[in-house]
Amino acid sequence: MQNLPALLLFCGVVCSAYPVDRAAEDENNNMELTQQYLENYYNLGKDVKPFVRRRNSGPVVEKIREMQKFLGLEVTGKVDSDTLAMMRRPRCGVPDVGDFTTFPGMPKWRKTHLTYRIMNYTPDLPRDAVDSAIEKALNVWKEVTPLTFSRTDEGEADIKISFAVRDHGDFNPFDGPGNVLGHAYPPGPGIYGDAHFDDDEQWTSDTSGTNLFLVAAHELGHSLGLFHSADPSALMYPVYNVLADLARFHLSQDDVNGIQSLYGGPPSDSSNDPVVPTESVPPGPGTPAACDPTLSFDAISTLRGEFLFFKDRHFWRKSLRTLEPGFYLISSFWPSLPSGLDAAYEETSKDIVFIFKGNQFWAMRGTEVQAGYPKGIHTLGFPPTVKKIDAAVFDKEKKKTYFFVGDKYWRFDEKRQSMEPGFPKQIAEDFPGVDSKVDAAFEAFGFYYFFNGSSQLEFDPNAKKVTHVLKSNSWLNC
């Protein structure tokens, strides 16, 4: 036991030194993170590296201040806890330097119709979910510009989209899970215009992992010529912002201003624009209030990238172009339609909205009723016992329409124009958690939204489960 004092002395020295060593190691890691971040995103020269440990080094402090200002942090010139937390968040791999919302020289496409090709797929999602996320991401920019997009499955394309890990041949390697989510190149030939996504991330259609739609909409903004924005509410802000409710997604005014500085606004005379009154209906006695906590909807449909929520004689129109929904009379848009609709859905490939009331339905393109309508709902294949439709939703990936009646549903094949055999089925059987009658339904962002009274259920068709319970009027900013 004579060596015990020496052993205790040794342990005391080591143990007391350990926190100091750990603190020094943390400090070293923080400095390395800062150095790398400033080199990657703020053009800090690699020859400045010896100065990074000198806290008052002019080049480093100025770059830290530049970063803090751009990212909306308190400008201290010091690597404080907020700055460290921001640097550790997932983000885009495109640098932030510059006081502009477009790339230097404002590169842009010299045409308004662009092609895109999905070169490969992530194993994290079904192929149709990836296709849908990319299409929706491009539609975000299509809504506010004259740009149109078409997909090709072979040959060259203006924008090539791919998933890759680590070094993938563009001298801009990915870094594994977290940190850099993707990067893209400004308009031009060859690799320019292409968007790459780090396949070490866990890509999802919801917010349980990294949402592919949100990241793709950002990266494709780069493919169209946009640089990063210093506005934290902008889609083009470099750091990934998770939205608790994807239904509330909209472009910021900064995003709109940036893309329209390159391409202008959408053509006002486009046949693809809904013809809707420019002025909303003023609220008055007897008109439904958007933020009434008991508000329910008669029917809901999409229309050329917008959302229409029908109630009695009125409807709300929600667009990605504007934050606030408009409120209109149905008769001002569709003079021949009745009020108090039962169901509606858009068949996007035909540019037609089908609207149901009682035992009849109408096919509308723009404001025009199509020839031969209204028709009886039994021409679709419903039995005589079905007197009306409660709700309908079109799955544009499968080209199927789901019709809900009471606690059952039918499925209609839009390609074959016939009701599928084996129906009706119980709603709860194939839509677990959707146990009550469905008043209205539609599809958006890869989810089905089922409405009953003042509540709505967000349903993931891939996972076959309800992911959120929301108020029906959450789409109206309530």
UniProtKB/Swiss-Prot annotation:
Q: How is the cofactor bound?
A: Binds 4 Ca(2+) ions per subunit.
Compartmental location:
Secreted, Extracellular space, Extracellular matrix
Checking CDD domains in the record gives: HX (cd00094), ZnMc_MMP (cd04278)
Q: Which cellular components does GO assign to this protein?
A: cytosol; extracellular matrix; extracellular region; mitochondrion
* Keyword Hydrolase (UniProt): yes
The UniProt record gives the binding positions of Ca(2+) 3 as: 175-176, 178, 180, 198, 201
What are the annotated glycosylation sites? 452
Q: State the top-level EC class.
A: hydrolase
- PROSITE patterns xref list: CYSTEINE_SWITCH, HEMOPEXIN, HEMOPEXIN_2, ZINC_PROTEASE
- For this entry, the protein name equals Stromelysin-1
Q: Where does Ca(2+) 4 bind?
A: 298, 390, 439
Q: Which reaction does it catalyse?
A: Preferential cleavage where P1', P2' and P3' are hydrophobic residues
Parts forming coiled coils: none
Query: Which species is listed as the source?
Result: Canis lupus familiaris (Dog)
Q: Which protein family is it in?
A: Belongs to the peptidase M10A family.
Q: Which cysteines are joined by disulfide bonds?
A: 291-478
Function as written in the Swiss-Prot or TrEMBL entry: Metalloproteinase with a rather broad substrate specificity that can degrade fibronectin, laminin, gelatins of type I, III, IV, and V; collagens III, IV, X, and IX, and cartilage proteoglycans. Activates different molecules including growth factors, plasminogen or other matrix metalloproteinases such as MMP9. Once released into the extracellular matrix (ECM), the inactive pro-enzyme is activated by the plasmin cascade signaling pathway. Also acts intracellularly.
Q: Where does Ca(2+) 2 bind?
A: 158, 190, 194
Family matches, as Pfam families? Hemopexin, Peptidase_M10, PG_binding_1
What does the record say about domains? The conserved cysteine present in the cysteine-switch motif binds the catalytic zinc ion, thus inhibiting the enzyme. The dissociation of the cysteine from the zinc ion upon the activation-peptide release activates the enzyme.
Query: What is an annotated GO biological process for this record, any one?
Result: negative regulation of reactive oxygen species metabolic process
Q: Which ranges belong to the motif Cysteine switch?
A: 90-97
